[in-house]
A protein has these predicted regions:
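Extended, charge-rich C-terminal regions with high alpha-helical propensity
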Residues: 1-4, 219-220, 225-227, 237-239
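Transmembrane beta-barrel wall of Gram-negative outer-membrane proteins
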Residues: 1-66
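Solvent-exposed loop/turn segments connecting transmembrane beta-strands
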Residues: 9, 166-170, 209-210, 238-249
Length: 259
């Protein structure tokens, strides 16, 4: 065959949720939340659908979040439980239908813990801010790829291009960011260092590795007059498994507009 083969995918997501503040005082608040999720994924080679990769899943989620204020610092913590269902025409995962030795199921049972810290402080006449974000995912059953924890992108362990990740049914990561308030209003320069690990089976094969570490530097801020927020950054891997291919330096940016 001469020519390029085009691999593409389409996804649809619907998430309906409710939340209620069940406790509030001067030092913090506690929120109970619930949601129902429906997701459909279809993949194609050229214009022909790969039917064994079609997914239609649904799940319910119940979570509890707490925010607490200590001086200038804000501490967040949360826990949630997600359970896969057969609601709304959800289909069994193809891993459930084929005897490949990997008993992953779309009827997932996922427990997720989160924690965060936002601490503004001053050194001399300079203003700084330290941020920490932590997430741990645990599961009693092997998970299909959409439900696995994947590390190695701008949302988990920064410094990687995101073209390849480490994915498995359980794991954790922590992001650490130190930001300096520049003389320009609402503009921050920041440095970050992240680390993450995954465990369990990722599919029918053995994981390439179990941990990643990366660093990042960037500039972010708001342009209030235009309703714009931006984040421009560059990052690099600090530690990765042998054979894990990624760019030695990664650049990226994001822009959002509110009106």
């Amino acid at each position: 065959y001469n020519g390029d083969i085009r691999y593409s995918g389409k996804s649809k997501n619907l998430n309906v949720g409710l939340s209620r503040v069940i406790q509030r005082n001067a030092s913090g608040k506690t929120t109970l939340r619930s949601s129902v999720q429906v997701r459909e994924i279809r993949n194609y080679i050229d214009r022909t659908e790969i039917e064994v990769q079609r997914r239609r899943t649904s799940a319910w989620l119940l979570g509890l979040d707490h925010r607490h204020y200590i001086g200038n610092a804000t501490i967040d913590g949360g826990v949630s439980y997600q359970r896969g269902t057969r609601w709304f025409g959800a289909m069994p995962a193809y891993e459930e239908q084929y005897e490949d030795g990997y008993d992953a199921t779309a009827k997932s049972k996922i427990l997720t813990w989160t924690a965060g810290l936002n601490w503004p402080f001053a050194l001399g006449n300079q203003n700084f801010r330290y941020q920490m974000n932590y997430l741990r995912q645990m599961s009693t059953t092997p998970l299909t790829s959409p439900d696995q924890l994947a590390i190695g992108n701008r949302w988990t362990v920064r410094g990687f291009d995101g073209e390849r990740t480490l994915s498995a049914s359980h794991g954790w990561y922590v992001q650490n960011t130190l930001a300096w308030q520049t003389p320009l209003p609402e503009q921050e320069f920041y440095l970050g260092a992240d680390y993450g690990e995954v465990g369990g089976r990722s599919d029918g094969s053995t994981l390439l590795g179990r941990h990643l570490a990366g660093g990042v530097a960037g500039l972010r801020g708001n342009i209030s007059a235009l309703g714009l927020s931006y984040d421009a950054f560059g990052g690099t891997p600090l530690s990765k498994p042998h054979g894990f291919k990624t760019d030695s330096v990664t650049f990226g940016f994001s822009v959002s507009w509110q009106y």
